[in-house]
A protein has these predicted regions:
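Gly/Ala-rich phosphate-binding loop of Rossmann-like dinucleotide-binding domains
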Residues: 1-2, 106
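Short beta->alpha connector loops
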Residues: 15-16, 92-95, 116-120
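Structural motif corresponding to alpha-helix initiation and N-cap regions
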Residues: 45, 71-77, 95, 119-121, ...
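Short beta-strand segments
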Residues: 57-58, 181-183
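Structural motif
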Residues: 85-86, 132
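Conserved phosphate/ATP/ADP-binding segment of small-molecule kinases
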Residues: 99-182
Length: 183
């Protein structure tokens, strides 16, 4: 939104000071919050990122209201996918909701970017709907058990249907693997 692009968010927040701050910030930057629901009795989800000098990070995630985002929340907001160019999906929401989001985005011809974090596995139904899959090295080891090397794991994700895989590597940059590119 800060770069002048239309941004729309679908998700859940709690009814707390955190959500008040989030709504004010999104409003200031022109983010469409029509798909954001306030959930009474829930805390707003939060993440704490600890970054080491070498670029490696440790992330602690408290899902909060994000854990209650349902596939129905996505389908009831399908109109928000109209004319979307990209759809960024984080897996701090339930995997079934992430799957429905990816399928819905694809149906609307949006490129899907999936950032798998805080999940024990990533089902084929999500991988196959990812135009761009962006795990870090640790997440890659969790979501892809086939292969021993990063390169083998990324290649297997392509076989499972991902369009391309970008593995972030802290201070070492990133590794890109697509159907016709590897670097």
């Amino acid at each position: 939104a800060k770069l002048g692009h239309r941004v729309t968010l679908i998700g859940n927040v709690g009814v707390d000071n955190g959500s008040d701050y989030i709504f004010k910030a999104m409003e200031q930057h022109g983010v469409n919050t029509a798909g954001v629901r306030r959930c009474a009795g829930e805390d707003t989800g939060s993440s704490f990122i600890f970054l080491a000098p070498n670029g490696e990070s440790v992330i602690a995630i408290l899902s909060g209201a994000n854990a209650s985002l349902t596939p129905d929340d996505i389908t009831s907001n399908e109109r928000l996918f109209d004319n979307a160019g990209y759809c960024l999906i984080q897996t701090e929401i339930p995997l079934e909701s992430a799957k429905v989001t990816a399928i819905t985005a694809r149906r609307h011809h949006a490129k899907t970017i999936i950032k798998p974090s805080s999940c024990d596995y990533l089902p084929d139904s999500i991988v196959a709907n990812a135009d761009i899959l962006v795990p870090n090295e640790h997440e890659l080891a969790i979501i892809e058990t086939e292969g021993k090397t990063m390169e083998d794991k990324a290649a297997h994700l392509l076989e499972r249907g991902a369009g391309c895989v970008i593995v972030t590597q802290g201070e070492h940059g990133c590794y890109l693997r697509g159907q016709n590119v590897e670097c």
